[in-house]
């Protein structure tokens, strides 16, 4: 059997990253272009366009694709796309630019020239409409809403040429991978069914349990962590990488899973982001996405299994990658092991509810972490990280984190 096809009608990866002489020539040309500065989110999106992670997109979305994606999870040509991929700038900057003009795309933080774009469209959007549809809220306390509300007032659309993957290939060597690379690894392992495990946390016992369930039913698992920006209080990628390596070395059969990483910032869009996670995992070659409790959620904005339900609401042919839905998992003292709501008959008093938020809060406040919460090797790395922090971040416990 072969791997799932890349997303889109043509079913082929479309990486937009230039190489060799073409890259040298286009970078030289772009030196004289007017510059458009990219936010961290936009830079991550551009890199995903570059490596083919956002196949079949060829650039940042125009108005009709933006509206279709926001309102119906479909672009103007009918391609399924659950979250808009857009580039914004100020009205003042947009007024200086004309349709058909080539612009240089520059990462605002590093100043690196990341790519170029031919402007095909300039348009304004209703930000509140986008937030309500995508995030199901316009609350500015929601980090994804804040991101959209703070972006420029004008969107620029057009085909892009990508020059760089930023620091990801060097900073996360051996972890950061392109879709072509993961597909090659899966094929070398003889895998055709591969489950992706999305994570922005070091893996506690529930995460380990979810991955092991997937290993039982698939050929292998891609533990695929987000390498872009998170909200304050979340644990940085280099620490997560060390934790996952320790866990894989001590508690997983070799050859059953691969640790990888991708360059996006977290959007915290809950159910909609779960769909995007499945979509680009299809491009990476994964047949399944593990969807547990409160996937891609934040606070109490989403129900614990809204991300399960949304997959039942999209057309059956929207994605080849399917959800591997797993119920609430926990450690049960009476079962003497990890269990779920489907397998454990005992009461809440017998269970230790596990969540990344709860673990971060305990570590941040120097509390004793219960024995069955995390593997000791992982805990040791996390305790060392928290001991090194000079500034404490206040972490709020939402209801899902405490088992409600």
UniProtKB/Swiss-Prot annotation:
Gene Ontology molecular function: ATP binding; sulfate adenylyltransferase (ATP) activity
Record EC number: 2.7.7.4
GO biological process, one term: sulfate assimilation
Top-level taxon of the source organism: Bacteria
Catalyzed reaction equations: sulfate + ATP + H(+) = adenosine 5'-phosphosulfate + diphosphate
Family the entry assigns: Belongs to the sulfate adenylyltransferase family.
Pathway annotation from the record: Sulfur metabolism; hydrogen sulfide biosynthesis; sulfite from sulfate: step 1/3
Protein name as catalogued: Sulfate adenylyltransferase
Protein's UniProt keywords contain GTP-binding: no
Keywords (A to Z) from UniProt: ATP-binding, Nucleotide-binding, Nucleotidyltransferase, Transferase
Gene3D superfamilies the record matches: HUPs, Sulfate adenylyltransferase
Xref: InterPro entries: ATP-Sase_PUA-like_dom, PUA-like_sf, Rossmann-like_a/b/a_fold, SO4_adenylyltransferase_pro, Sulfurylase_cat_dom, Sulphate_adenylyltransferase
């Amino acid at each position: 059997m072969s791997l799932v096809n890349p997303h889109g009608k043509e079913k082929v990866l479309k990486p937009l990253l230039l190489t060799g002489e073409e890259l040298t020539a286009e970078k030289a040309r772009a030196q004289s272009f007017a510059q458009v500065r990219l936010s961290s989110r936009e830079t991550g999106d551009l890199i995903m366009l570059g490596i083919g992670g956002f196949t079949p997109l060829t650039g940042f979305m125009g108005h009709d694709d933006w509206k279709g994606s926001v309102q119906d999870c479909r672009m103007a040509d009918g391609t399924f796309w659950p979250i808009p991929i857009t580039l914004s700038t100020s009205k003042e900057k947009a007024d200086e630019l004309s349709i058909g003009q080539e612009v240089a795309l520059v990462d605002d933080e590093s100043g690196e020239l990341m790519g170029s774009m031919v402007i095909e469209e300039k348009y304004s959007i209703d930000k509140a409409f986008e937030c309500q549809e995508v995030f199901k809220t316009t609350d500015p306390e929601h980090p994804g809403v804040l991101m959209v509300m703070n972006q420029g007032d004008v969107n620029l659309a057009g085909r892009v040429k990508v020059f760089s993957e930023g620091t990801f290939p060097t900073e996360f060597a051996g972890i950061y991978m392109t879709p072509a690379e993961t597909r090659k690894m899966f094929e070398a392992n003889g895998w055709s069914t591969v489950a992706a495990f999305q994570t922005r946390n070091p893996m506690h016992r529930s995460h380990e349990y979810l991955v092991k369930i997937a290993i039982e039913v698939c050929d292998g698992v891609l533990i695929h962590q987000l390498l872009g920006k998170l909200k304050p209080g979340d644990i940085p990628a280099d620490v997560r990488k060390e934790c996952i390596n320790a866990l894989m070395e001590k508690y997983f059969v070799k050859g059953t899973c691969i640790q990888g990483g991708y360059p996006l910032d977290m959007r915290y869009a809950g159910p909609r982001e779960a769909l995007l996670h499945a979509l680009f995992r299809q491009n990476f070659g994964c047949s399944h996405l593990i969807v547990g409790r409160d996937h891609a959620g934040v606070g109490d904005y989403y129900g614990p299994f809204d991300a399960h339900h949304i997959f039942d609401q999209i057309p059956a042919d929207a994605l080849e990658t399917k959800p591997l839905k797993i119920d609430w998992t926990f450690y049960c003292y009476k079962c003497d092991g990890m269990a779920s709501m489907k397998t454990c008959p005992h009461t809440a008093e017998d269970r230790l509810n596990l969540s990344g938020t709860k673990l971060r809060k305990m570590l941040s406040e120097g509390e004793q972490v219960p024995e069955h919460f995390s593997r000791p090797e992982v805990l040791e790395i996390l305790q060392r990280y928290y001991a090194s922090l000079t500034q404490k971040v206040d972490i709020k416990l939402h209801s899902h984190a405490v088992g409600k």
